[in-house]
UniProtKB/Swiss-Prot annotation:
The chain crosses the membrane at residues 295-315, 443-463. It comes from the Eukaryota. InterPro entries: MDM33_fungi. It comes from Aspergillus terreus (strain NIH 2624 / FGSC A1156). This is Sensitive to high expression protein 9 homolog, mitochondrial.
Length: 466
């Protein structure tokens, strides 16, 4: 069987020979106006296959100018039928005219407009604004801290579950959870065993009823034995033969019922044992937790007592010594300031008297010049005597004030003596007014609450019934 291209080639050769002998050139019909405007395709090399010769070629993009298109013509895309018919007519004409197979043919080309390229200066369109609101774009703009926080919140439930599991492992509650699961399994087993017992009872009852009915019918046949017909004889033989089968079925149903009841009893006993074991383990676990809480309460109370003793034995005396030392330094500083002020007040009238004594000899210098040195010496001696007297008085006053302040300071006994503790207790319950900050008041309240809770826990632990 010859191929289609070979047959076409032979037909073209025969028609070409006939046309050459006739010497009658045949003109091709004129092309329509809408096909003349199609761009020409590049010629292809010779190919045996005619389908390859008429393959669609891609051409360059034609200028998209609407002004060049005539108004009275239509585009080729609107005349697909006319284009196909024209191609068929041209093929027939070429075949009749004897054109060689390697002649070039017109090919249809499809023109596609390239996609518009956005310019960089062009404003954002609706697509770009829509792209900015996409979840992926917003997710990429999130900070790393926000992503970590989201991941942590997503894993929070699993982390809490893992922490609870670790706590159960430490306290021993995981074994109790295993016992709970085992109890659920035993409950399912007991439920299935009871259902099996119910089915076995029904099967045993049906076997008994079937055998009883068979025996009842046999007894009826035996009562009218003298009037048996062939059908009755056959029926009696059948019933007598099935009696053994019914007996075996009844015995098997009874054994199955006994086994099902035994299994149900074992499942119930195992369930009761598991429940008792779980109750015992929960009691032990609760006792351990209560014991741990008791020891924790004792430890908290011991810490509070230790802090109280440390504050009363070490911190409180050190604070009192620091306050006393600071008070003494302030008193000494006040005494020094008072001494300096008294010294300045005493020196001011002495300087005024010396100035007045110096002015008087200057006025009398013209009258009596010889006795002037004697008077000057007398004045200087008097001033030195006054200064010595004033300095001695100031020192005596400062010493007296220092001694009086020291006498006014409270005598602090030793911190380990009985008098110090008696004085401290008396000071605790005295009516002395003092200024305290809110922080100190809050710390005292918290310490009192902790001490009260510790004492109440101790009392409850002691009077709790064993």
């Amino acid at each position: 069987m010859h191929s289609l291209p070979l047959l076409l080639r032979q037909s073209l050769r025969s028609t070409g020979a006939l046309s050459r002998s006739a010497h009658r050139p045949i003109r091709a019909p004129p092309l329509p106006s809408h096909l003349l405007r199609l761009p020409t395709a590049h010629p292809r090399p010779f190919s045996v296959c005619l389908q390859c010769q008429f393959r669609t070629q891609s051409a360059s993009y034609p200028p998209n100018k609407e002004s060049d298109k005539p108004l009275d013509t239509e585009t080729p895309s609107k005349h697909p039928d006319s284009t196909a018919s024209f191609l068929e007519e041209s093929l027939k004409t070429q075949a009749e005219a004897g054109t060689p197979a390697d002649s070039t043919t017109t090919t249809t080309t499809t023109t596609t407009s390239p996609p518009p390229q956005p310019t960089p200066n062009e404003p954002k369109t609706a697509d770009s604004s829509l792209r900015d609101t996409l979840p992926s774009y917003l997710d990429n703009r999130r900070s790393q801290f926000s992503k970590q926080f989201t991941t942590m919140m997503d894993n929070l439930q699993s982390n809490i579950f893992v922490a609870g599991q670790r706590l159960n492992d430490l306290t021993g509650y995981s074994e109790i959870e295993a016992l709970k699961k085992e109890i659920h399994t035993q409950e399912d087993r007991l439920r299935a065993a009871r259902l099996h017992v119910r089915n076995a009872k029904e099967a045993y009852a049906s076997a008994i009823n079937r055998r009883s009915a068979s025996q009842r019918e046999v007894n009826e046949l035996l009562q009218r034995k003298h009037a048996w017909s062939p059908v009755d004889l056959e029926r009696f033989t059948h019933l007598y033969r099935n009696d053994h089968t019914n007996e075996v079925a009844e015995n098997e149903a009874q054994e199955a019922l006994t086994a099902a009841e035994r299994e149900a009893e074992e499942a119930a006993a195992q369930l009761s044992k598991s429940i008792l074991s779980r109750y015992h383990e929960e009691q032990v676990w609760s006792d351990k937790i209560r014991r741990m809480s008791t020891w924790g309460t004792w430890g908290l109370m011991g810490v509070n007592v230790l802090l109280f003793l440390v504050f009363q034995i070490a911190v409180e005396p050190w604070r009192r010594k620091r306050l006393v030392k600071g008070f003494e330094e302030k008193v000494i500083e006040a005494i020094e300031k008072e001494r300096e002020m008294n010294h300045v007040e005493i020196l001011s009238p002495t300087a005024a008297a010396a100035t007045a004594g110096a002015v008087a000899p200057v006025e009398a210098a013209g009258e009596d010049a010889a006795p002037a040195p004697v008077e000057e010496e007398t004045t200087s001696d008097g001033a030195s005597v006054v200064e010595d007297t004033t300095g001695g008085v100031v020192e005596d006053r400062a010493d007296l004030a220092h001694e009086s302040y020291k006498a006014q300071l409270p005598s602090l006994p030793s911190t380990l003596s009985v008098d110090s503790w008696r004085q401290y207790l008396h000071d605790l319950f005295s009516e002395r007014s003092m200024i305290i900050t809110q922080r100190d008041l809050s710390s005292v309240a918290l310490q009192s609450a902790a001490a009260g809770a510790a004492v109440m826990g101790l009392v409850i632990a002691l009077i709790r019934p064993r």
